[in-house]
């Protein structure tokens, strides 16, 4: 058996010295030192040896193992270094090559328009309020005078998380939350993302931006609403812009109206953007419904107020003559670099 061990040692050393890559070295290691390797097999057969032979063979076997492991380690180190140098040789970096130009970002047109609108309202004394996008059904509907089974709910295809939790369909819930925790006077705007289960096309998106406003105090009238929104329109679109109000219906305001402005592309003469009418619908508005005030803990006999709401995406599309809302969400730098 001692001769067999010496023979294994000599054969293994020859193979190790011939090894030129890591794969060959691993194969040799398994062949001689693995669980089913030749040296391991001999060690398992030591039980058949006499008591006198066992210590001699055991000592020799351990010596052979140590020699082979040391040689394998040395060759492995040399081979890995050679492989590293070969890899570096084949992956030479040409430092004279021009670098890749980094794309420089800029403010998205939606963000630009939001900032402009917020700046105008803040200059008029409005505070900016925020609220959850995942909202309770109560704040999104019932607090705003839209009870269950109200026909207005069918107009808003809603994403329901469960029976009582929705993705907000408007930023009006922020107003309800503010009225609950704060007594008048209240003067606020609530910009943010809203969600509706609309099929995506040129004018509809399941995610878009709104900005809604609310003013509550004693003796607030429709004249205050008109004055506020007309001033906003002049600051947003220029002093020459004209506005008009048309009667409308919203469940959370009474009376309700929609405000139109003279087309800022053709100055009211009629064009493709305004469909030849000279006017563009800008927003919905109205006096806060007394029931909404009651729902939020405010006495409608003492206080009154007005509310309004913009579709920010629509404002951007109208302002820049964009005819497809999908362009605002595709992150195409060829489009965004125009703003």
Curated annotation (Swiss-Prot):
MF terms in GO: ATP binding; catalytic activity, acting on a protein; magnesium ion binding; phenylalanine-tRNA ligase activity; transferase activity; tRNA binding
A Pfam family hit: tRNA-synt_2d
EC annotation from Swiss-Prot or TrEMBL: 6.1.1.20
PROSITE patterns: AA_TRNA_LIGASE_II
Major localization listed first in the record, in broad terms: cytoplasm
UniProt xrefs under InterPro entries: aa-tRNA-synth_II, aa-tRNA-synth_II/BPL/LPL, Phe-tRNA-synth_IIc_asu, Phe-tRNA_ligase_II_N, Phe_tRNA_ligase_alpha1_bac, Phenylalanyl-tRNA_Synthase, tRNA-bd_arm
SUPFAM superfamilies in the record: Class II aaRS and biotin synthetases (SSF55681), tRNA-binding arm (SSF46589)
Gene Ontology cellular-component terms listed: cytoplasm
Compartments (UniProt record): Cytoplasm
Cystine residue pairs: none
Domain of life assignment: Bacteria
Cofactor binding, per record: Binds 2 magnesium ions per tetramer.
Subunit organization: Tetramer of two alpha and two beta subunits.
UniProt similarity note: Belongs to the class-II aminoacyl-tRNA synthetase family. Phe-tRNA synthetase alpha subunit type 1 subfamily.
Protein name: Phenylalanine--tRNA ligase alpha subunit
Organism: Clostridium perfringens (strain SM101 / Type A)
């Amino acid at each position: 058996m001692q001769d067999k061990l010496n023979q294994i040692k000599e054969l293994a050393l020859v193979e190790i010295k011939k090894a030129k890559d890591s794969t060959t070295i691993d194969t040799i290691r398994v062949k001689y030192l693995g669980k089913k390797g030749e040296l391991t097999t001999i060690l398992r057969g030591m039980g058949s040896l006499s008591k006198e032979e066992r210590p001699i063979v055991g000592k020799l076997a351990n010596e052979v193992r140590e020699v082979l492991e040391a040689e394998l380690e040395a060759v492995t180190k040399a081979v890995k270094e050679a492989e590293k140098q070969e890899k570096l040789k084949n992956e030479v970096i040409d430092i004279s090559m021009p670098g890749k130009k980094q794309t420089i970002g800029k403010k998205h047109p939606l963000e630009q328009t939001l900032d402009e609108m917020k700046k105008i309202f803040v200059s008029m004394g409005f505070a900016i309020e925020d609220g959850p996008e995942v909202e309770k059904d109560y704040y999104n509907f019932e607090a705003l005078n839209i009870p269950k089974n109200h026909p207005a709910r069918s107009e808003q295809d809603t994403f329901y998380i469960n029976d009582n939790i929705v993705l907000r369909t408007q930023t009006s819930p922020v107003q309800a939350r503010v009225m609950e925790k704060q007594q008048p006077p209240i003067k606020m705007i609530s910009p943010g993302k809203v969600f509706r289960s609309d099929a995506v096309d040129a004018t509809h998106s399941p995610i878009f931006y709104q900005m809604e406003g609310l003013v509550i105090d004693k003796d607030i009238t429709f004249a205050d609403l008109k004055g506020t929104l007309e001033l906003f329109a002049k600051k947003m679109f220029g002093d020459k812009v004209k506005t008009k109000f048309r009667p409308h219906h919203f469940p959370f305001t009474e009376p309700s109206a929609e405000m139109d402005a003279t087309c800022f592309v053709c100055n009211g003469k009629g064009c493709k953007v305004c469909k030849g009418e000279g006017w563009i619908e800008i927003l919905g508005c109205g006096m806060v419904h007394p029931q909404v005030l009651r729902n939020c803990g405010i006495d409608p006999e003492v206080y009154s107020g007005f509310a309004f709401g913009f579709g920010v995406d629509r404002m951007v599309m109208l302002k820049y003559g964009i005819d497809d809302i999908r362009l605002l969400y595709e992150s195409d730098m060829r489009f965004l670099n125009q703003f």
